[in-house]
């Protein structure tokens, strides 16, 4: 999934991505992304809850990869402990209302469809998504 996403949406970037599977019950989430540096980040760790259904796992990974893309392209930034999205301070906005989260939740669904469609075309998938619309990220 990660290789598919990077090849499709960030092919010219040299990135290091570690994926860690562990219990995130105490963190009250299914996954999160950490960058080792906030200045032109290229090294990332994606932490994923180790006990998820396959569909939740895939969508959560895609959600975090959207955030990775936001960081790499510079639309998501951290300055002085504050989160900025497209130049706007979003730190005081509730989590589910933050614009970068809204984008990631929307795109995780679209990417899930696109990923499965691409896997079907390559003979690796198990779903039939031929009739679903195309989209661009």
Where are the language model's segments positioned?
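Zn2+-dependent metallopeptidase catalytic core
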Residues: 1-14
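Active-site scaffold of zinc-dependent metalloenzymes
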Residues: 22-55, 71-72
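Substrate-binding/catalytic groove segments of enzymes
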Residues: 69-82, 113-123
